[in-house]
Amino acid sequence: MALYWCTDDIMETYNDEPYATEIPPADKKYLPMASGHSITTALGFLEVADVIVGHNIIGFDIPIIKKFYPWFTPSGLVVDTLLLSRLYHPNLLDIDKKHGLNHMPLQLYGRHSLESYGYRLGEYKGNFAKTTDWKKWSQEMQDYCVQDVVVTNKLCQHFHPYLNGSR
């Protein structure tokens, strides 16, 4: 089960494939603001998902979720694209230099961050995270979080051939 969007406080599945290669249809909307109920519902879906994918999900996201929701225990496979990046691209600086990514800031060369991958994959994340204290919801925050999902999905697609043995 791959969870990509929610409408009317109900998480919907877009694709039952663990490595979906499509972005949700444009007519599907993310909730403008999460309520405690929708967060608990979403975490319930994540607990029973066959696969959960995130960038630094093992080192950051899951520990933060457990801090606020101690009962949260994913039962499926957890795929961390940060770990995959470090495993399959240990020479990322050389790769970046070889490709000459003129649009990517030099300080991001060789980094395994989601921001760096946003540039590499043509899905720029934006500057919101650098300009906010994250204390109050805003549409900019929502858009930034949605873009995080888009970049992570594209990064997962990048690593899929490595994981299924076709690369």
Segment roles from a protein language model:
Residues 7-39, 51-165:
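Active-site-proximal helix-loop-helix substrate-binding element of RNase H-like nuclease domains
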